[in-house]
């Protein structure tokens, strides 16, 4: 498989896209308005002609794909993929997101056309794990959603033995042979199978190493990248501004902390395989009105502070009994109780 070309070379995408990137690119430091996120002027370090996208810029910005991390967390090697700095976040150059997404899309179709296999990797967060599993199952690919086990690629012989044991247990549990075992032995087999299912459920049919890895977070799952690089297995990764692009063969600069943008990008990558097989696509070729992104709840808590309430503490908002016990006292009663406590203290000191 071909490695990603150096940023100083001309790169061609699926849709006759040409990019000439300079290695000494500087990040624009002036703040940008929300309109800039949609209009997205082409950076000085890139020239894009006749761009045809797999997903619209409007949909990408709606998903928050252009929002990077705080500049304190950035990796300077990602400078070529950053459009500007706004407020407390970097802004990812979304035109480059589209460009490199096209490139990864074309590469995946070549892999699928040659009968290659794909492994999706995403071990961060319940929602990401569910997305990884759904897209992998849609394309009959392998997936890893639990902690990356060392040697999954480099020590494949040992992994194969574990897979053989796992599949043997599954076959045993589905057959009548299991009735020949005692109740205690059946419980032990079930426990062992459940443990194997947790780590090997997404790769139980894998007979050989995958031909390409797709990672949601190359920082969190860097061990998977290290193993893939040792074996020259190409890596496609959704890279935020804290990633190291030199470890990734097919980088997709995008916000990989947004469930919406992850859903969008993973959907496009899975569509590359589905489209080649003649199966219906989920994102590619569909109008924006038909692309439904998941709804996410705001992480901000409601401010319930009311200065008119004496002794109010938001900590006790949901604990009415404690809150009322403290606040229902009249000022006179509170003052009287304070004086009584003071007399007790003075009396104790005199004694």
Swiss-Prot record:
InterPro entries from the UniProt entry: Ribosomal_uS2, Ribosomal_uS2_bac/mit/plastid, Ribosomal_uS2_CS, Ribosomal_uS2_flav_dom_sf
GO cellular component: cytosolic small ribosomal subunit
Keyword Ribonucleoprotein: yes
UniProt record, GO biological process: translation
GO molecular function: structural constituent of ribosome
Matching HAMAP family: Ribosomal_uS2_B
Protein family per UniProt: Belongs to the universal ribosomal protein uS2 family.
Protein name according to UniProt: Small ribosomal subunit protein uS2
Organism: Ureaplasma urealyticum serovar 10 (strain ATCC 33699 / Western)
Taxonomic placement: Bacteria, Bacillati, Mycoplasmatota, Mycoplasmoidales, Mycoplasmoidaceae
């Amino acid at each position: 498989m071909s490695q990603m070309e150096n940023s100083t070379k001309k790169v061609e995408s699926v849709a006759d896209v040409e990019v000439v990137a300079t290695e000494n690119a500087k990040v624009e430091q002036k703040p940008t308005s929300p309109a800039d996120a949609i209009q997205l002027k082409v950076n000085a370090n890139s020239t894009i002609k006749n761009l045809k996208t797999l997903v619209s810029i409007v949909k990408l910005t709606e998903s928050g794909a252009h929002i990077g991390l705080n500049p304190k967390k950035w990796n300077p090697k990602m400078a070529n993929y950053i459009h500007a700095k706004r407020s407390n976040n970097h802004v990812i150059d979304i035109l480059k997101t589209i460009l490199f997404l096209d490139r990864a899309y074309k590469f995946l179709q070549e892999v699928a056309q040659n009968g290659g296999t794909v492994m999706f990797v995403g071990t961060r967060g319940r929602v990401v794990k569910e997305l990884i599993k759904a897209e992998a199952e849609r394309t009959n690919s392998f997936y890893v959603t639990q902690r990356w086990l060392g040697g999954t690629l480099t020590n494949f012989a040992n992994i194969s033995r574990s897979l053989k044991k796992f599949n043997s247990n599954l076959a045993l549990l589905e057959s009548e042979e299991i009735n020949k075992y005692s109740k205690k032995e059946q419980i032990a087999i079930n426990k062992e199978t459940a443990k194997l299912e947790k780590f090997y459920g997404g790769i139980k049919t894998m007979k050989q190493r995958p031909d390409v890895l797709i990672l949601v977070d190359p920082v969190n799952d860097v061990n998977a990248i290290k193993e893939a690089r040792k074996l020259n297995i190409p890596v496609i990764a959704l890279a935020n501004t804290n990633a190291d692009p030199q470890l990734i063969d097919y980088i997709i600069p995008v916000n990989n902390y947004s469930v919406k943008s992850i859903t969008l990008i993973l959907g496009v990558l899975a569509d590359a395989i589905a489209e080649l097989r003649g199966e219906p696509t989920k994102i590619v070729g569909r109008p924006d009105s038909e692309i439904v992104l998941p709804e996410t709840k705001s992480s901000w808590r409601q401010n319930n502070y009311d200065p008119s309430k004496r002794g109010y503490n938001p900590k006790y908002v949901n604990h009415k009994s404690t809150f009322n016990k403290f606040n229902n006292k009249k000022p006179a009663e509170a003052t009287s109780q304070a004086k009584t406590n003071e007399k007790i203290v003075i009396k104790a000191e005199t004694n």
